[in-house]
Each structure stands twice: as structure tokens, then as C-alpha cells.
Amino acid sequence: MAFEFIFEFLHGCHIFYLTRVPSPAIIAQAFTDVKPKIIISVPLIIEKIIRKKVFPKIQNNRMRILLNMPYVSKKVNRKICEQVTNAFGNNFYEIIIGGAAFNQEVESFLKKIDFPYTVGYGSTECAPIICYSDYKTFVPGSCGRAVVHMEVKIDSPDPENIP
């Protein structure tokens, strides 16, 4: 709650909560209506929106051919990113994803189209956010770097090769 409410409240942000049980359609409509600047979400919400609204449009033979053509694929990916951005309200800086593991297929897709997302890590028991990186410096498959004034220790016999 500290990261999702208090931080934004102290900085003068408007905070919107859904008044209905969320579904991909309700959430997508809320993004269109509210046009948020920052989106903080669990992976499942982002994955459902991508799988239901985006993947069906790009998983046909024509799109597969276009996405495998070197020069054309860049333009197609740019257009796909634009459409995905529109699906999230077209007004945000980045989407911060956390609370569970992020599906690798969806993460690879978002990275491929150069979508502004990042994955953070927090632990409700000790801190609202422990690791975070801006989407411009985020490394896919990671959960960012330790935030300022946070010390992180990996308690493992082999901290360099954690599975």
C-alpha cells in the first residue's frame, strides 16, 4: 500500500480504483477513460490483456511473415507497440509490474516491440519496493536494481548462479 498509495498521494497524484471486479475488458476500458501516467500491476493483468487483445491479432500467417522480414519487422513492431500503448491509455510513462513472476513469452514480446515496462520487486513485510529500474535501463528477466538507500543481500551458497 505504501508504494501504490502513499507515495502517489504525497506527490499530488490522482489514484483510481476500480469499483467492479476486474476483467481484461473492464481494465482496458478504465485505461481508456483514465489515461494513467504510471501503471502499477501484477503480471497476470498485463499478461491477460496482451494474450486477449494483442496475440490474436499478430498470430496469423500474414503477420508472421511480416515479423520475420528484417526491415519490415521493425516498422511492424513499432506499429504493434503503438497499438499496445493505446490499449493502456496512450498517456503513461511506463508500466511497473510486480508481485509475482512475469511470463517470459509476454516479457520477450514486450521487449521485442520496445514497450515501456519494467519489473520491480518488493516485500510487503519489510518494504514496499526493494528493486526497480526505469524501463530505459531495465534488463529483461531481472527485477531491477536495489533502490536508493536499500541494501540487498543474496543469501545463497552460489549467489552468482541462482536458478
Sequence positions of predicted segments:
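Conserved AMP-binding/adenylation subdomain of ANL enzymes
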Residues: 1-78, 82
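Conserved AMP-binding/adenylate-forming
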Residues: 39, 76-163
